[in-house]
UniProtKB/Swiss-Prot annotation:
Function statement: One of the primary rRNA binding proteins, it binds directly to 16S rRNA where it nucleates assembly of the body of the 30S subunit. With S5 and S12 plays an important role in translational accuracy.
SS bond list: none
Xref: InterPro entries: Ribosomal_uS4, Ribosomal_uS4_bac-type, Ribosomal_uS4_CS, Ribosomal_uS4_N, S4_RNA-bd, S4_RNA-bd_sf
CDD domains cross-referenced by the UniProt entry: S4
Stated family: Belongs to the universal ribosomal protein uS4 family.
Keywords: Ribonucleoprotein, Ribosomal protein, RNA-binding, rRNA-binding
Domain S4 RNA-binding: 98-161
Keyword Ribosomal protein in annotation: yes
Superkingdom, natural source: Bacteria
An annotated GO cellular component: small ribosomal subunit
Gene3D superfamilies found in the cross-reference section: Ribosomal Protein S4 Delta 41, Chain A, domain 1 (1.10.1050.10), RNA-binding S4 domain (3.10.290.10)
Protein name: Small ribosomal subunit protein uS4
Organism the protein comes from: Helicobacter pylori (strain G27)
Length: 208
């Protein structure tokens, strides 16, 4: 499945939750979801009954859209999560959170995961001092993620850091804002990852 390129705020209204797809509008409270917290279209305010399969599929789609992951990548991550010891659903969220594009977003260097992905693919991100342009790379504990020197003064990066000051940084990451780098100190616990996703439904879907 190709990445969604349609109206992202319409998508958020369909799922009924913020997917963090519109950074500045989301933080300012001006997103379409803030104004109209119901589905798009003529019958958007009606709540149609959904089957168990429909709920499971919707949850997977929501997670893929939120993190900007293709079906092939998502399934690959699930297979790895299922291989690891522990709860498969929790493993799934932890693995997704370790993706380089997501870590760049979590460090506050971009207002959306999509913008963070562009920083990575365009070669603006260093991992342990070396350029890495693979958004799906799994960051390990202790690794240093840095914005390339020439990009540190980029207005979009600077603005993203200003906006992040309103929301704070997640506890498994340390960031030196002035120097535009951060350390992925440890893997997150599931309860620390605040995302509107019921991973149990995704596990049920893939387990059929």
């Amino acid at each position: 499945m190709a990445r969604y390129r349609g109206a992202v705020e319409r998508l958020e209204r369909r799922f009924g939750v913020s997917l963090a797809l519109k950074g500045e509008r989301r933080l300012s409270g001006k997103s379409a979801l803030d104004k109209r917290a119901y589905g798009p279209g003529q019958h958007g305010q009606r709540r149609a009954k959904t089957s168990d399969y429909g709920l499971q599929l919707k949850e997977k789609q929501k997670a893929k859209m939120m993190y900007g992951i293709s079906e092939k990548q998502f399934r690959s991550i699930f297979v790895e999560a299922n291989r690891l010891d522990g709860n498969t659903g929790e493993n799934l969220i932890r693995l997704i959170e370790r993706r380089l594009d997501n870590v760049v977003y979590r460090m506050g260097f971009a207002t959306t995961r999509s913008s963070a992905r562009q920083l990575v693919t365009h070669g603006h991100v260093l991992v342990d001092g070396k350029r890495l342009d693979i958004p799906s790379y799994f960051v390990r504990s202790g690794q240093k993620i840095e914005i390339k020197e020439k990009t540190k003064s980029n207005p979009q990066v600077v603005r993203a850091m200003e906006l992040t000051a309103q929301t704070g940084i997640v506890p498994w990451i340390d960031v030196e804002k002035d120097k535009k780098y951060g350390i992925f100190t440890r893997y997150p616990e599931r309860e620390e990852v605040v995302v509107p996703i019921e991973e149990r439904l995704i596990v049920e879907l893939y387990s059929k």
